[in-house]
A protein has these predicted regions:
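Negatively charged, low-complexity tracts enriched in Asp/Glu with abundant Ser/Thr
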Residues: 7-62
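A recognition module on extended beta-rich or small alphabeta surfaces enriched in W/G with H and D/E
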Residues: 95-125
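Conserved aromatic-histidine-acidic binding/catalytic patches
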Residues: 30-33, 64, 98-101, 105
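Intrinsically disordered, low-complexity regulatory segments enriched in Ser/Thr/Pro
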Residues: 77-105
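Amphipathic, interaction-prone secondary-structure segments
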Residues: 52-80
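Short, surface-exposed, charge-dense and proline/glycine-enriched linear segments
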Residues: 32-39, 85-96, 118-124
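Short, highly charged C-terminal tails/helix-capping segments
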Residues: 124-137
Length: 137
């Protein structure tokens, strides 16, 4: 799926089509996505969460990865919006131990780290008029 040579899968692919956790994650990401347009230093954001910048080659403006469990990596993939298309923040997973994780746990980790990234946005943009969600974490 990407140029990094790893199979990247969604929570829906891990849990199945009826995954309630994919809907939970999608809703949480949609509410927070606009704030990530304020990220000026992607490397700094990656360090803030203990992750690293990755180039997945899927048309993203930036993506970060974070190992959340031995053999389980989460990828936060951001695409800036423009006049024609809205922006998006998506999450994908990879790793040899992905199938031993519960969807509920993966969703929890995703939301936890996205909220932590919002703190970074708030701390690095002290004078900006940020989306309200940045002030709720």
């Amino acid at each position: 799926m990407g140029s990094i040579g790893k199979k990247l899968i969604s929570l829906r692919e891990i849990e199945g089509v009826a995954s309630p956790h994919q809907r939970q994650v999608d809703s949480a990401l949609a509410a927070r996505q606009k704030a990530f347009e304020y990220v000026k230093d992607v490397v700094g954001l990656a360090k803030y969460i203990g992750g690293k910048v990755e180039s997945l080659g899927i048309g993203e403006d930036w993506s970060l990865s974070k190992e959340i469990f031995p053999g389980v990596r989460v990828y936060f993939v951001f695409v800036k919006g423009d006049e024609e298309f809205p922006g998006s923040l998506k999450v994908l997973f990879s790793g040899k131990n992905i199938n031993v994780m519960k969807g509920e746990d993966l969703a929890g980790f995703v939301i936890l780290y996205v909220n932590h990234m919002l703190r970074y946005v708030r701390e690095t943009n002290p004078d900006a008029n940020l989306p309200e969600v940045c002030y709720r974490v």
